[in-house]
Regions:
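Walker B catalytic motif
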Residues: 168-172, 179
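Conserved structural motif at the start of ABC-family nucleotide-binding domains
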Residues: 2-4, 17-19
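Q-loop/switch helix immediately C-terminal to the Walker
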Residues: 82-86, 92-108, 120-123
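ABC ATPase C-loop
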Residues: 159-160
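Conserved beta-strand-loop-alpha-helix hinge in the C-terminal portion
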Residues: 219, 223-245
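The feature captures the beta-strand-to-loop junction immediately N-terminal to the Walker
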Residues: 33-35
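ABC ATPase NBD Q-loop/coupling interface
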Residues: 59-75, 143
Length: 251
């Protein structure tokens, strides 16, 4: 599904990504962990097409297409979804209208007609029930006045409605209490299918207690320096990142 080869990226003239290699297959959950400043959020920004970052070398292929040639909006239409660390507020635009526009943009891109109003509302209700979101949030302006937990739940609801092929959760556990964390994780787990994939970017273990990864990568100084199974999460929780840094410096 996603193939990253020797990816280098700079921001404001400083190289942040220094040769990322990674492959994500359909049906898999990958966790990317690492200390602050390692390049985790830069990687998610590059994959989703943020203008701030310049790719200087490497390739990114998504379902056979050159992802780096696509503008950000077409990457979303192709099925890439980003859950932000700090979701933005959009005053005056209700959640339900935002989602209707987004869904119909994707359908138009794929040569499909707009969703009939009745079918759309039926689908919305099914997704609300699936991820356990309060119906009151639908008619409120997108994220405006939402608590941190409500914003994150709303993003998982958006993910349920948009049905992305690849979901990137960038520090989605930031600022969540344990109940909100569990709710978000349960929603993500319910949306997992053999046809889609998820990348979970996090600094801490606790989210990965609920979303169990198939593959764990450690990102350090702009490179993936270690890849293993879920057992690596417990090792990092026990020993921190210092042993990884020492291992890298010793090479």
């Amino acid at each position: 599904m996603l193939k990253i080869k020797n990816l280098h990226a700079v921001v404001d003239g400083k190289e942040i990504l220094k040769g990322i290699n990674m492959e994500v297959k359909a049906g898999e959950v990958h966790a990317i962990m690492g200390p602050n400043g390692a390049g985790k959020s830069t990687l998610s920004a590059v994959l989703t097409g943020r203008d701030k970052f310049e790719v200087t070398e490497g390739e990114v292929e998504f379902n056979g297409k050159n992802l780096l040639e696509l503008p950000a909006e077409d990457r979303a239409r192709e099925g890439i979804f980003l859950s932000f660390q700090y979701p933005v507020e959009i005053p005056g635009v209700s959640t339900v209208n935002f989602l209707k526009t987004a869904v119909n943009e994707i359908r138009k891109y794929r040569g499909q007609p707009p969703y009939p109003a009745g079918d759309f509302l039926k689908m919305i209700r099914q997704k609300m029930e699936l991820v356990g979101i309060d119906s009151k949030l639908l008619n409120r302006s997108l994220n405006e006045g939402f608590s941190g937990g409500e914003k994150k739940r709303n993003e998982i609801f958006q993910m349920a409605v948009l049905e992305p092929k690849l979901a990137i959760l960038d520090e989605t556990d930031s600022g969540l209490d344990i109940d909100a964390l569990r709710t978000v994780a349960n929603g993500v787990n319910k949306l997992k299918t053999p046809e889609n994939a998820t990348i979970v970017i996090t600094h801490y273990q606790r989210l990965l207690d609920y979303i169990v990864p198939d593959v764990v990568h450690v990102l350090y100084d702009g490179r993936i320096v270690k890849t293993a199974g879920k057992e690596l999460v417990a090792e990092l929780e026990k020993h921190g990142y210092d042993w990884i840094k020492e291992e890298v410096r010793g090479v």
